[in-house]
Amino acid sequence: MAKKKGKGKWRKALKWSDKTLQNAQQTDIVIPIMGATGAGKSTFINLFFDKTVAKTSDSLNSCTADVKDYPGPWRKDLSRRIVLVDTPGFNDSHEDEAEILRRVSVWLAKAYDDGMRVAGVIYLSDIAQKRVYGSTRLNLTMLQKLCGDDFYPRIVMATSHWDEVPLHVGEPREEQLRENFWAEIIGKGGKTWRIITRDDALAAIDSIAEEHRRRGLQTDSGTSTSSSGTTVNEDAIALLLQRELVELDKIIPATGAGKELKGNIRNLLEVLKHEVAEEQDPEKKAELQRKLQFLRSQVKQLNIPLGERLRIIFGFYQV
């Protein structure tokens, strides 16, 4: 039986400049690459292709502003494509968080509505980081809100930048990530991986692709037809965000990811308000006030209109 789909409110968030998956094939193996700015997402994609296809940066200034997909043949089945999806990190150096969420959301919703299913997600963490920063925590929390715990078995939690630290330094950091930050995902089936060489990147991708194929997500069992005419398997596990936007017809601010991001920005607002009140230097105070206004504009983007709040209160999103 086909899953119920809403009217497609997410489409109202689309902009002419948005890049979405083009020339999708039913056999595509779609794998978003996620993580904080500077974690090595573009580098990972270049390892897969064994050449530079995604622009990288040597600093914490992000080179990934848009969601961009990179299709290439799967080495274990040349009739199928691996589609790696480069995503901007939250706490990006150039874009506001609400805009990043919008871009990620419309890409995923469009792919899902067109019948494409995400095979798995690779989340990258920089092992060279001496401590876990607020931006790292935010990106990890957003990963959980975007995916939902039903999808955890299809997440690979990978560490990068091993060439920048000796093993005796990196291994305790990796253990801390596993025990303190990744425990919930790992406990529900998520895998861990070290990305040191190209072979490591290929193996991580293969693990997702092989599991995707093993589960038979592209078989004719339990299929229906999407709005674009593509045959899809309704037994496939989708990202929570995709189900919220396409099946439950939520607007982006009403999703779990939208609410989480708004809460994070509001917390930053409170901290910044205190800094503005205490700052004595006129120039520094003016700069803080500009940042304050910028954060307020993001909160406004993530506000839920009254009509949508009533739908939530009265349970219209229940399936």
Spans of model-derived segments:
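"Short basic amphipathic alpha-helical interaction patches in structured regions
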Residues: T87, E99-L101, T136-T141, E171-Q176
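Conserved nucleotide-sensing/catalytic segment adjacent to the nucleotide-binding pocket
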Residues: A54-V118
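Extended hydrophobic secondary-structure segments that form protein cores and membrane-embedded regions
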Residues: P32-I33, L84-D86, A119-D126, V156-H161, ...
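Conserved catalytic-core segment of NTP-binding enzymes
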Residues: M142-L146, H161, L167
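Inter-motif core of Ras-like GTPase G domains
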Residues: H94-K130, L138-D150, V156
